[in-house]
């Protein structure tokens, strides 16, 4: 049984201390970790944080999708990629954060082996998809700034997005074979990983870190290096143009200034999207760097303090990335949420007006019925009076 515990490595995408421990192994000389127990105080903090992250991720990304759907001008590539990044973040929230939250509450995985493998598979699909959509956004902004005359066709955009989702689905397949429902104690079962010893866990975690973090971050760095260089070149050219404009005549000066101002407006629009994508990338790096640092450390160092609080915090910090992006969208593309707010206000106003019209119609119909009844009763009374007189 002890050998089976040693097969379970830190790469289970579970922030709980129960899954980040290796049974009956001693870390730091005299610290023995028992996989059948957990720190209840830490578990309560994890449950609270994950519940908050789940709520913010669901609410924020659903608002982004609704705003993009209801907006008038959302045919650009940027909005298309934003939509798929929000979908990927929703996948992370529903299939990674939510199962982890339930798992932290129940302490053990209660479900069949098929569900264990499915949960582990879907947990990585969202991570791959979110990362690759972010890479696509950065490449798109790099092309828009460095080669503005080159226009990616909408079909190519769709092909790139489909390829990203396909790679996410394929790269997550090893999770199905690594994790299964296993007995970790006398009659105690949990969703546990089985790596080939002694190199299996190291190879797998290194490969995951390369495909989700190291290679994408290198691509992102290259894209923003080119973008920064191109913006610097553009700034120098505009400065020279402004100096040349001051030497022209007054008549041509107005026309030239109008042309330059229009160019500046286009550049500002592009630079705004570049800033937004850069902040999204920065948030991704801040949230995921501690996570992958911890993963690599725990894989290559058998004496890594897996139950130390910095390890737990780094795991929880990774979950925050799925709820950061909507707030970044709101800051840089506030008109989307303003349009959504206006649409909701218009819908509520129309609903109130329609309900008021229905009430007025019902009131008018009741009033007409009452007047008809009064007329009928009055005419009947007159007929009775006339008959009595006669």
Curated annotation (Swiss-Prot):
Keywords: Cell membrane, Disulfide bond, G-protein coupled receptor, Glycoprotein, Membrane, Receptor, Transducer, Transmembrane, Transmembrane helix. GO terms for molecular function: oxytocin receptor activity; peptide binding; vasopressin receptor activity. Glycans are attached at residues 14, 19, 24, 30. Residues 70-86, 146-160, 228-276, 333-390 are cytoplasmic. GO terms for biological process: cellular response to hormone stimulus; maternal process involved in parturition; positive regulation of vasoconstriction; regulation of systemic arterial blood pressure by vasopressin. It is a multi-pass membrane protein. CDD domains: 7tmA_OT_R. It comes from the Eukaryota. SUPFAM superfamilies: Family A G protein-coupled receptor-like. One of its GO terms (cellular component) is plasma membrane. Expressed in brain, intestine, bladder, skeletal muscle, lateral line, gills and kidney. Disulfide bonds join 116-191. The chain crosses the membrane at residues 49-69, 87-107, 125-145, 161-181, 207-227, 277-297, 312-332. It is found in: Cell membrane. Residues 1-48, 108-124, 182-206, 298-311 are extracellular. Belongs to the G-protein coupled receptor 1 family. Vasopressin/oxytocin receptor subfamily. PANTHER family: NEUROPEPTIDE RECEPTOR-RELATED G-PROTEIN COUPLED RECEPTOR, OXYTOCIN RECEPTOR. Binds to isotocin. Can also be activated by vasotocin, mesotocin, oxytocin and Arg-vasopressin, although these have lower potencies than isotocin. Produces an induction of membrane chloride currents indicating that it is coupled to the inositol phosphate/calcium pathway. This is Isotocin receptor. It comes from Catostomus commersonii (White sucker).
């Amino acid at each position: 049984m002890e050998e089976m515990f040693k097969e379970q490595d830190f790469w289970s995408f579970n922030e709980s201390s129960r899954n980040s421990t290796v049974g009956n192994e001693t870390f730091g000389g005299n610290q023995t970790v028992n996989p059948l127990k957990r720190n209840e105080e830490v578990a309560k903090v994890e449950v609270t944080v994950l519940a908050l992250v789940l709520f913010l991720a669901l609410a924020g990304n659903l608002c982004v999708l609704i705003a993009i759907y209801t907006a008038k001008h959302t045919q650009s590539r940027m909005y298309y990629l934003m939509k798929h990044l929000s979908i990927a973040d929703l996948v992370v929230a529903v299939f990674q954060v939510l199962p982890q939250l339930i798992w932290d509450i129940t302490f053990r995985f209660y479900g069949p082996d098929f569900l264990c493998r499915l949960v582990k598979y879907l947990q990585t699909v969202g991570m791959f998809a979110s990362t690759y959509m972010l890479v696509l956004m950065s490449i798109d902004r790099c092309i828009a700034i460095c080669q503005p005359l080159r226009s990616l066709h909408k079909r190519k955009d769709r092909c790139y997005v489909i390829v990203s989702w396909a790679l996410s689905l394929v790269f997550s397949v090893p999770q199905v074979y690594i994790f299964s429902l296993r007995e970790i104690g006398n009659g105690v079962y949990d969703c546990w990983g089985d790596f080939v010893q002694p190199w299996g866990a190291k190879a797998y975690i290194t490969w995951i870190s390369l495909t989700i973090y190291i290679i994408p971050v290198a691509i992102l760095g290259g894209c923003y290096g080119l973008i920064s260089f191109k913006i610097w070149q553009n700034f120098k050219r505009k400065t020279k143009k402004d100096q040349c404009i001051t030497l022209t005549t007054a008549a041509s000066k107005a026309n030239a200034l109008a042309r330059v101002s229009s160019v500046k407006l286009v550049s500002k629009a592009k630079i705004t999207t570049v800033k937004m994508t850069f902040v999204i990338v920065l948030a991704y790096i801040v949230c995921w760097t501690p996570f992958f640092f911890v993963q690599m450390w725990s894989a290559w160092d058998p004496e890594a303090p897996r139950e130390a609080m910095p390890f737990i915090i780094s795991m929880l910090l990774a979950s925050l990335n799925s709820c950061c992006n909507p707030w970044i969208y709101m800051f840089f593309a506030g008109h989307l949420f303003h349009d959504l707010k206006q649409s909701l206000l218009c819908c509520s106003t129309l609903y109130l007006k329609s309900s008021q019209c229905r009430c007025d119609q019902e009131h008018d119909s009741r009033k007409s019925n009452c007047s008809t009844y009064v007329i009928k009763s009055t005419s009947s009374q007159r007929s009775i009076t006339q008959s009595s007189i006669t």
